[in-house]
A protein has these predicted regions:
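Hydrophobic transmembrane alpha-helices and their immediate junctions
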Residues: 405, 495-541
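Hydrophobic alpha-helical transmembrane segments in multi-pass integral membrane proteins
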Residues: 95-103, 194, 200-252
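Long extracytoplasmic/lumenal interhelical loops at the membrane interface
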Residues: 425, 431-447, 451, 455, ...
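Membrane-interfacial, low-structure loops and terminal tails that flank and connect transmembrane helices
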Residues: 6-59, 116-149, 233, 513-527, ...
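Alpha-helical transmembrane segments of multi-pass inner-membrane proteins
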Residues: 38-83, 91-115, 151-168, 177-183, ...
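Aromatic-anchored transmembrane helix interface
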Residues: 214-215, 239-251, 260-283, 292-301
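Transmembrane alpha-helices of multi-pass inner-membrane enzymes
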Residues: 95-110, 403-410, 530-591, 600
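Membrane-interfacial loop-to-transmembrane alpha-helix junctions, especially the N-terminal start
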Residues: 62-69, 186-197, 233-246, 292-297, ...
């Protein structure tokens, strides 16, 4: 086995030169193979059963599904009106009317086609793109030898479900149908679940502990592991994974040994959501998948931004700008919305940058403007400071030398506030502008959290808001916040100083990797996505100086997915470059600009 020096590990690649002039990633690919008997043997019979089920569902005529959905919706409506007529209802619930109508409206288009479901979906341009291009579901082509379920069976199932919906709440039956469809599509394609999570992410504010989100991620991981075991997906194990697993292990230890069951549950949730890095880093294997991921985030941001703008207009007309605390839209707090919009604005700017079609550029420019307006109405003015830092980070990546160091300095520059001497801090506290911006309040929170960290240096105080509040009560009675308000400080307080070192190692590898690797692939389209993910990471690090960016579990998951996307796109860009160099058989062509090919 090859031995690597510490600087090679931190740099992210070895110094060995390949015959085509490319550098070699320090990574290992893992996939299903004949020598992995425990995986392939276990999944062999299950895979055959699932493939048979997939074949039946795919080749069942669309008319069967239309009959099932239409009969279920229409008959449910009739049965509930009968219940209203005989006096079981004062009035038919609005929820019943909506659910029944939705199923009827969905079912009617399916009644118009006799083609198998998979073929019918491929025949329509919109559904073909959504299911088979965007969500990467495997295409099933027409096969007359395959027989599905007849329409008569669909009608019978629709009647049975409608009767069941009259006995139990209809929304429960509808939810079970939706959940089964979601599970099937998830196990059919892990990309479906992975991308759909981003679309629903803004609407998970009810899931304050992140448990529901963790369940969705766990299902995606199981589907992805199944594909890896069958040899249909690849897992990339790199030095980032080592640092991530160390950090997650510290979170687990803190969750188990420090503050009981609640802390343990929170740690398990954080571990599962941290696997967003693994999913993004391994599922994204080409530019199309990278664009799908970024588009999923952008798509989900548009309705949220519109809601935030409307909410702000209503609130400002009522209380005025001076008393307006900021829009939160579907999120629980304005600063959480600001984090999400920082990511979506950056990705929409990326598409404005790389798209050549003028109409598409205008569309993404409009989305950028809408998101930017919504970001302003969060009243999180530190977010605009981070946008300036992001612009500097983007420019730094164009430097031929020293860009990694500049990225690191931009990330930690704001933390120099922690080094201000105590007497000077007192002067800063007295400044009216500083008080208005809340900086003095933040510094006081940091000082209290530092005392707590000093006494819980290695194991931390436990995971979650409850653990933090329980421990901080031993140091002050005048603390009305659920965290320290600083990203790195809060990570250290909750999971111990080793978790901070592990995260620092991950980040150091990224900026070193990005700084040295950028000139090698600087004109690759996929590399541009990686550049923007680096910009986002730097911005979130800076934004985290005065906000704990992982307080909301959706943003914690989003952070690791964006970070994983950066790793994946670097790897893909490197592979594309090496393949082009090998194709042109010109080992002297060190600059990719002379032979760059736009991969679509």
């Amino acid at each position: 086995m090859a031995k690597y020096t510490l600087i090679e590990i931190i740099s992210g690649y070895t110094s060995a030169q390949r015959s085509n002039g490319g550098k070699k990633f320090l990574s290992q690919t893992v996939t299903g193979s004949a020598n992995r008997v425990s995986i392939t043997g276990f999944s062999k019979h299950v895979a055959k059963l699932f493939d048979k089920l997939t074949s039946i569902i795919s080749y069942t005529p669309s008319r069967t599904y239309g009959a099932l959905l239409t009969v279920f919706g229409a008959l449910s409506l009739v049965l509930h009106f009968i219940k209203d007529y005989i006096g079981l209802y004062e009035v038919v619930p609005l929820r019943v009317l909506i659910v029944s109508s939705v199923f009827v409206l969905i079912g009617i288009p399916f009644l118009l086609s006799e083609k198998p479901l998979s073929v019918a979906l491929q025949s329509n341009r919109l559904t073909d793109y959504v299911f088979f291009e965007f969500f990467c579901i495997r295409r099933m082509h027409k096969n007359d030898s395959e027989k599905g379920i007849s329409a008569v069976v669909g009608v019978i199932l629709g009647v049975m479900l409608a009767i069941l919906g009259a006995c139990v709440p209809l929304w429960i039956v509808a939810s079970v149908i939706g959940a089964l469809a979601y599970l099937f599509l998830t196990f059919l394609s892990p990309e479906f679940s992975f991308f759909s999570i981003f679309i629903v992410m803004p609407y998970l504010s009810f899931d304050t502990e992140g448990i529901f989100l963790a369940i969705l991620v766990a299902l995606t991981l199981v589907s992805y592991a199944r594909k890896v075991g069958l040899g249909k997906r690849v897992y990339f194990f790199e030095q980032y994974d080592v640092g991530l697993f160390i950090m997650l292990f510290c979170i687990l230890i803190s969750g188990i040994f420090v503050k009981g069951v609640d802390s343990f549950v929170s740690s398990v949730v954080m571990i599962l959501l941290g696997m967003g890095y693994v999913l993004a880093g391994s599922l994204v294997t080409n530019r199309r998948l990278a664009d799908c991921l970024t588009n999923a985030i952008i798509i989900s941001s548009v309705p949220v931004s519109i809601i935030a703008i409307v909410e702000s207009a209503i609130e400002l007309s009522r209380v005025g700008l001076g008393s307006f605390s900021g829009a939160s839209a579907t999120f629980d707090k304005p600063y959480t919305l600001a984090i999400f919009l920082l990511v979506s604005v950056s990705f929409s700017v990326y598409f404005v940058d790389v798209r050549r079609n003028r109409a598409v550029k205008v569309l993404y420019a409009f989305i950028t403007a809408v998101n930017f307006i919504a970001l302003f109405f969060t009243m999180s003015f530190w977010a605009f400071g981070t946008l300036i830092v992001g612009a500097l980070a983007f420019s730094a990546q164009k430097m031929r030398h020293g860009s990694g160091l500049v990225l690191l300095l931009l990330s930690i520059f704001a933390y120099t506030l922690l080094l201000v001497p105590g007497q000077l801090r007192d002067v800063i506290y007295a400044n009216d502008v500083v008080r208005a911006l809340g900086l003095s309040d933040s510094m006081q929170r940091w000082e209290t959290a530092f005392l707590m960290l000093r006494d819980n240096l290695f194991l931390g105080v436990g995971i979650g808001d409850d653990s933090f509040l329980e421990e901080i009560a031993n140091y002050t009675t005048d603390f009305s916040y659920t965290n320290s308000g600083n990203f790195l400080l809060e990570l250290s307080c909750e999971a111990g100083i080793i978790s901070l070192f592990a995260f620092g190692l991950i980040y150091l590898i990224r900026v070193r990797h990005r700084g040295i690797y950028q000139p090698y692939i600087k004109n690759s389209h996929v590399s541009k996505i990686s550049s923007y993910t680096t910009v986002i990471t730097v911005m979130l690090m800076v934004y985290g100086v005065f906000n704990y960016i992982w307080a909301d579990m959706t943003m914690y998951y989003l952070f690791w997915c964006v970070f994983g996307l950066g790793s994946a796109t670097l790897r893909v860009a490197k592979q594309e470059f090496d393949d082009r160099v090998a194709y042109f058989s010109d080992g002297s062509a060190e600059d990719s600009s002379s032979i760059d090919i736009s991969i679509r």
